[in-house]
Amino acid sequence: MRAKWRKKRTRRLKRKRRKVRARSK
């Protein structure tokens, strides 16, 4: 389920990559 959510929001992740990385952990 997480992998699919990342692929669907892959474009937004690229913009907030720093915040996303901290949230992922």
Swiss-Prot record:
UniProt entry tagged with the keyword Lipid biosynthesis: no
Keywords: Cytoplasm, Ribonucleoprotein, Ribosomal protein
Chief localisation class: cytoplasm
Subcellular localization(s) per the UniProt record: Cytoplasm
GO CC term (a single one): cytosol
Start and end residues of each stretch annotated as Disordered: 1-25
Subunit structure: Component of the small ribosomal subunit (SSU). Mature yeast ribosomes consist of a small (40S) and a large (60S) subunit. The 40S small subunit contains 1 molecule of ribosomal RNA (18S rRNA) and 33 different proteins (encoded by 57 genes). The large 60S subunit contains 3 rRNA molecules (25S, 5.8S and 5S rRNA) and 46 different proteins (encoded by 81 genes).
Name of the molecule in the record: Small ribosomal subunit protein eS32A
